[in-house]
Amino acid sequence: MIDSVDPTKNFNPLWRAIFSGEHPELRRGRKMFRLMSPTAHDRCRLCYAGFDGFSAPVMRAIGRGQWLRNPHFCEKCESVLAQERGGAEIEIAMLYADVRGSTQLAAGMRPAEFAALMQRFFQTAIKIFTWTDAIVDKMVGDEVIGIYVPCLTGPDYRQRAVAAGLKLLRATGHADPAGPWLSIGVGVHSGETFMGSIGVEGGNYQFAALGDTMNLGARLVGAAKGGELIMSATVWNDVSGEISAEPRSLELKGYAERVTAYVARIQ
């Protein structure tokens, strides 16, 4: 029998302060690192430590070099967040992208060849996520997930998520006359999620985004055919004046009612 769960146990005021940019130590740190790295153009999105310019070697020496998984953050900020248990409920946009027909692809290739193809896909996705100010949430199997947090990405976080999805479709060759080098589908949704560091007491913890919003995003990408970006109505309302899309009524697993989504393709 599962014990009852207190939903407030995982809430942490530090995470809320970080996501809002109002944490006092964060404000002091940003002021200090701006002074220490006056020539930096690329900075940690949390503490503002400079990743380039004349102070970059010093930043690396004190543990403020770029975190490899998410180049928008320094290694120190990542370690602090990983150790700070709990999180906060915040509004985000998420982008899911996964490979179409990966089982058949893997069956027709040597394991090393398939691994190289997935590596190319992940590298392409991460580069686009970096350009559009996303957090790389997960790279699992044949799927990659990017998270767009307003306090880090800006008020146009939904538009950036859609732009990233379209860039990824183009980068994988879906606009090429010869066809894509890898067929993928993309799903974009937005809403409130729980974001923070979760895991087992005394065991491993990881940074994660959880909730029904994430589940719906996963269902949307599952409904996308190769070359399609399927977005929820929430996202479409923000980008309808910028791109073309057609409505599609979807029957999604786990949802009692059909969901109206919008399908965009590379022109």
Residue ranges and their predicted role:
Residues 84-163:
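Catalytic NTP-binding/metal-coordinating core of nucleotidyl cyclase/transferase enzymes
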Residues 41, 45, 71, 75, ...:
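Short amphipathic alpha-helical segments
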Residues 128-160, 171-212, 260:
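Catalytic core of nucleotidyl cyclases, primarily class III adenylyl/guanylyl cyclases
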Residues 168-171, 175, 201, 219, ...:
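Conserved, well-folded catalytic cores of nucleic-acid-processing
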Residues 1-90:
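Regulatory cytosolic signal-relay segments
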Residues 94, 185-186, 228, 261:
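A residue-level structural signature of the nucleotidyltransferase/glycosyltransferase Rossmann-like core
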Residues 225-267:
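Cytosolic regulatory/linker segments at or just downstream of nucleotide-handling modules
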Residues 100, 192-193, 215, 234:
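Alpha-helix/helix-capping structural signal
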